[in-house]
């Protein structure tokens, strides 16, 4: 009994001390850019930690978040391009400042991150964590060597998915230093929008038919391989199965896709909706569709579709996928077709609709997947648990 009481007191004391350590911990987040879509998680980090933020100054035409939403100190540094690499000016001196832990974007092409990781080994009681895609499964021998050196310099890595974590464990990384954090969008806004949504006949009115409705949300670009959807629809039509397709977005492939739709006699079944920046309007379009089709890399499109209750189909070659493919649960929140195989895409679309399903139950499963694993609240709990 005495031993039990002593152990219990020690355990309670350790929990208390850990809470004190976390309360007093000074964190610094160093990122390549303050992407607008990451606003929610950056705000939560700001609320839950004593954190300063250091962001790179440019990332093409990607929208930047509003720095005034963060109460912690925010500093913008110049991302100096060096061929295919880059260097963040002013980052190295942060090692000498009063921070206990650092979170850095884990990009091997960032030279300043390499130097930062190496120099951190000379600073006692400072920990550097990386936030990264980690492993894809398509790395060359040289890339594997470089990545192993890079990630093993850190004290831990926050990964977007379990797929990357399993690959890294197979490469010899310590599983206790690999943390799956997933990804997130503007979840609170999407949730508020979702609560207002209800089934409508928007597609029946536009198309004048009762066909199942396919949808794609994103830029109409080459990498999305959207021509595959049109060819698959044509093959389905030859077999007596007709579908509607709504393309929400714009891009350099629009005219080419319009021409292809005409050639395949699908103009009455394809709606080039254009870009949509109103979340309520966009949410309604996704919510009332039956299946989101993303033949290329699915990425954030999967999260956007699932949060509003629509399942997703994409290709099954995971080394070329983005981590969000993990939100697709076979037969529940979507399905996969063979990479770059139009016949397989055709078959999978037909199979999805020929299998008896309760649309409302599918909707709930899609929403549940996002609600449980792909929110800033899930991410902040992973950070709080592992930044110790």
Model-derived regions, located:
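Conserved donor-binding/catalytic core segment of Leloir-type glycosyltransferases
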Residues: 202-224, 230-233
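Donor nucleotide-sugar binding/catalytic pocket of nucleotide-sugar-dependent glycosyltransferases
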Residues: 152-202, 209
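Short hydrophobic beta-strand element within catalytic cores of glycosyltransferases
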Residues: 311-320
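Nucleotide-activated donor-binding/catalytic signature segment of Leloir-type glycosyltransferases, i.e.
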Residues: 248, 255-276
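Acidic donor-binding loop of glycosyltransferase active sites
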Residues: 284-297, 310-311
């Amino acid at each position: 009994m005495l031993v039990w009481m002593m152990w219990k007191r020690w355990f309670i004391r350790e929990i208390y001390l850990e809470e004190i350590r976390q309360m007093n911990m000074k964190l610094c987040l160093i990122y390549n850019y303050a992407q607008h879509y990451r606003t929610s998680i950056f705000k939560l980090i700001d609320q839950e930690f004593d954190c300063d933020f250091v962001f790179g100054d440019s990332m093409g035409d990607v929208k930047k978040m509003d720095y005034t939403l963060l109460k912690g100190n925010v500093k913008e540094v110049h991302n100096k391009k060096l061929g295919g690499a880059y260097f963040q000016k002013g980052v190295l001196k942060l090692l000498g400042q009063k921070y206990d832990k650092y979170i850095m974007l884990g990009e091997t092409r960032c030279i300043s991150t390499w130097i930062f990781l190496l120099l951190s080994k000379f600073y006692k009681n400072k920990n550097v964590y990386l936030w990264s895609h980690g492993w894809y499964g398509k790395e060359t021998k040289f890339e594997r060597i470089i990545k192993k050196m890079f990630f093993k310099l850190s004290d831990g890595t926050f990964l977007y998915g379990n797929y990357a974590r399993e690959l890294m464990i197979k490469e010899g990384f310590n599983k206790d230093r690999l943390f799956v954090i997933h990804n997130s969008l503007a979840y609170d806004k999407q949730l508020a929008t979702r609560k207002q949504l209800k089934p409508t006949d928007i597609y029946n009115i536009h198309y004048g038919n009762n066909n199942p409705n396919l949808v794609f949300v994103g830029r109409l670009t080459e990498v999305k391989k959207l021509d595959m959807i049109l060819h698959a629809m044509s093959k389905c039509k030859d077999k007596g199965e007709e579908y509607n397709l709504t393309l929400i977005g714009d891009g350099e492939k629009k005219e080419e896709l319009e021409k292809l739709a005409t050639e395949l006699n699908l103009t009455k079944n394809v709606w080039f909706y254009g870009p949509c920046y109103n979340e309520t309007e966009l949410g309604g379009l996704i919510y009332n569709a039956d299946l989101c089709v993303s033949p290329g890399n699915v990425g954030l499109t999967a999260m956007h579709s699932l949060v509003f209750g629509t399942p997703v189909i994409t290709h099954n070659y995971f080394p070329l996928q983005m981590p969000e493919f993990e939100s697709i649960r076979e037969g529940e929140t979507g399905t996969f077709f063979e990479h770059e195989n139009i016949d397989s895409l055709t078959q999978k679309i037909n199979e999805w609709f020929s299998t008896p399903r309760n649309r409302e139950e599918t909707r709930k499963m899609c929403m549940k997947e996002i609600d449980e694993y792909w929110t800033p609240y899930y991410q902040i709990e992973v950070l709080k648990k592992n930044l110790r």
